Amino acid sequence: MGRKVLVGLLVLVALGTIAISQRHKILIPLITTGAQIPQLVDASPVPGGQPFGDENHFSIVQLDEKTFAIAEPYSWARNVNYLILGDRRALLFDAGVGHYDIRPVVESLTDLPVTFMPSHFHYDHTGQGNWTKIAIVDLPHIRERADGNLLQPTWGEHLGDGEGIELPTWDVT
């Protein structure tokens, strides 16, 4: 009897450990449909924001002479992305979910070549990552995973599967 209880407890501990370590792979498919999350009906107003585009998905706020906040007030994530203008290049820090292309917004604000840099690899910050120049923080554990200049975020880093967004492979410069 005691041995059965011990084996049962060990099995429960093993299952609990697996469930905790794989929780996102278990929960996301259970709570999502794999379809795009609809836009919000009511936007969060962006103080001083100028709507952009036919659907006003983006709202632009100029923070200073060379810095723009590009908000997505109708996105469930309500992201704020930043465009920072330099003398020779511009840096786009985050690019939203990517259901609406942020590129026309960026092109309306600068003629400079743009380097995209995500704050992290979740899909709601990478804009689906199809940029000519992509910069990633150069950390040893990320460099080890790269195949030359090609880098693919892991499923757990990206989490786009819940909205049917496939893992990207980025050509990092």
Locations of regions flagged by a protein language model:
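Positively charged n-region of N-terminal signal peptides that target proteins for export
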Residues: 1-4
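Extreme N-terminal tail/first-helix region
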Residues: 39-45
